[in-house]
Amino acid sequence: DFDEGMNYAKKEKKPILVNFSGHGCVNCRKMEASVWTDEQVNSILTNDVVLITLFVDDKKKLDTPIIIAENGKKRTLETIGDRNSYLQRVKFGANAQPFYVLLNNEGSPLEKAYVFDENPQNFVAFLEKGLKNYN
């Protein structure tokens, strides 16, 4: 959960890495298999950030649907995936996965977002730049 993760990160005094993903996202699985398994990436994800993974295709119903206005129309967010997808579109202006954004404890981006790129060193550079901007 986004809010839960944000609160935890603030308490731990760590930046947040939000991972917008999908259960059916092939490129997301490729990133996890080829990039997240890199020793340096894994160390940063484990020790230096709070990782929040938000699935945009999660079909689990929200306890309470959320009514929003988007593009001049009322719409109801009924599932966790609906809410996560809405958050990605509205807060970060993107609708593709995988999509990674590093945030400070107030929810502001620390670095330009990162999208699909299977080069572990590029992902490390993204993470390190965000960590530097956090400190």
PLM-predicted stretches and their roles:
Residues S34-V41, N71-N135:
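Non-catalytic, surface beta->alpha helical segment in thiol-disulfide oxidoreductase systems
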Residues G24-N27, K59-L62, A96-P98, S108-L110:
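Flexible loop/turn segments at secondary-structure boundaries
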Residues K11-R29:
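Short active-site neighborhood of thiol/selenol oxidoreductases, capturing the structured segment around
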Residues S21-H23, E32-D82:
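Thiol-based oxidoreductase modules, predominantly thioredoxin-like and allied folds used
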Residues D1-I16, L45, R89:
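A short beta-strand-turn-helix
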Residues E12-I16, T46-I52, N95-P98, N105-S108:
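Loop/turn elements at helix/coil->beta-strand transitions in domains of secreted/extracellular proteins
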Residues R29-M31, T64, K112-Y114:
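Short, solvent-exposed loop/turn and secondary-structure capping segments
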